[in-house]
Amino acid sequence: MKFSTLKTVLIGFIFLPALFSCSTVPKDIPEELTAQELIQKGQSEFENGRYVASLAYYNAVTERYAEYPALYLEASYEIGHLYMKQKKYDKAKVVFQEILDIYANSQPGTLPGSYNKLSQVEMQKLQDKN
């Protein structure tokens, strides 16, 4: 086998996975999916390392269910967690601060407390990095 042919084959093996991973990003997210289905798909994509697709599903929740605070907070927290995993700390900080602001401006007991506490923990991690 000639060197140039071997080189072409090796390059193909290197870039082929990247090509297929890009094809998993949803172009259109079905409108009939519930918030829980969207979150589940986002988590599945995250676990498989497909962060762009994961973000698309979580963003769909924040856009479609913005009037449902518990769903909005859950998806927002997942977005912040995703940014932390990618080491996009500036973006994560914005998301977690928004979550904390929502809690600060709401009546106590009206929202699930878990995302407030989780966001506080993540913000502390961000401060420790500085």
Where are the predicted features?
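Structural signature of alpha-solenoid helical repeat junctions
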Residues: 33, 70-71, 108-118
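C-terminal motif of bacterial Sec signal peptides marking the signal peptidase cleavage site
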Residues: 18-21
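Bacterial signal peptide processing site
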Residues: 23-25
